Amino acid sequence: VQECVSEFISFITSEASERCHQEKRKTINGEDILFAMSTLGFDSYVEPLKLYLQKFREAMKGEKGIGGTVTTGDGLGEDLAEEPFTSQIPAGLITTDGQQQNVMVYTTSYQQISGVQQIQFS
């Protein structure tokens, strides 16, 4: 299962990275991931994820605290109330467009956002 998940993430990330490259950007954002999912045939997940992303950004908006920033798709930084990253997982090397990059994956848990249902993958 882990191999399949890794391949899926690489598949989506590669498509999102290609879009960023075409638009001469270096950072993949949520909209790039959603675009990639739609392009690759995962349309049924795009709308619920758009809603979740919107609700997540609304929940993060206005929280203030440690001085860290979150960059949203509109390019605006937002202050965070708490340290958002609770652990780091070294992800090794991911190949995108023929180049290898060192990547650090940050994980955390957030409260359930009201009005958003969890997505069940099957």
Curated annotation (Swiss-Prot):
Q: Which UniProt keywords apply?
A: Activator, DNA-binding, Nucleus, Transcription, Transcription regulation
The record's Pfam families line, in alphabetical order, gives: CBFD_NFYB_HMF (PF00808)
- Extract the SUPFAM superfamilies matched here: Histone-fold
Cell location: Nucleus
GO cellular component terms given for this protein: CCAAT-binding factor complex
Q: Which GO terms describe its molecular function?
A: DNA-binding transcription activator activity, RNA polymerase II-specific; protein heterodimerization activity; RNA polymerase II cis-regulatory region sequence-specific DNA binding
Chief localization class? nucleus
Give the InterPro entries listed for this entry: CBFA_NFYB_domain, Histone-fold, Transc_fact_NFYB/HAP3, Transcrpt_fac_NFYB/HAP3_CS
Annotated spans, B domain: 1-57
Annotated region (C domain) at: 58-122
Q: Where on the tree of life does the source sit, at the highest rank?
A: Eukaryota
The record's region (Subunit association domain (SAD)) falls at 1-12
Recorded domain comment: Can be divided into 3 domains: the weakly conserved A domain, the highly conserved B domain thought to be involved in subunit interaction and DNA binding, and the Glu-rich C domain.
Q: Which family does it belong to?
A: Belongs to the NFYB/HAP3 subunit family.
- Oligomeric and partner information: Heterotrimeric transcription factor composed of three components, NF-YA, NF-YB and NF-YC. NF-YB and NF-YC must interact and dimerize for NF-YA association and DNA binding.
Function, in words: Component of the sequence-specific heterotrimeric transcription factor (NF-Y) which specifically recognizes a 5'-CCAAT-3' box motif found in the promoters of its target genes. NF-Y can function as both an activator and a repressor, depending on its interacting cofactors.
Q: What is this protein called?
A: Nuclear transcription factor Y subunit beta
Q: Which gene encodes it?
A: nfyb
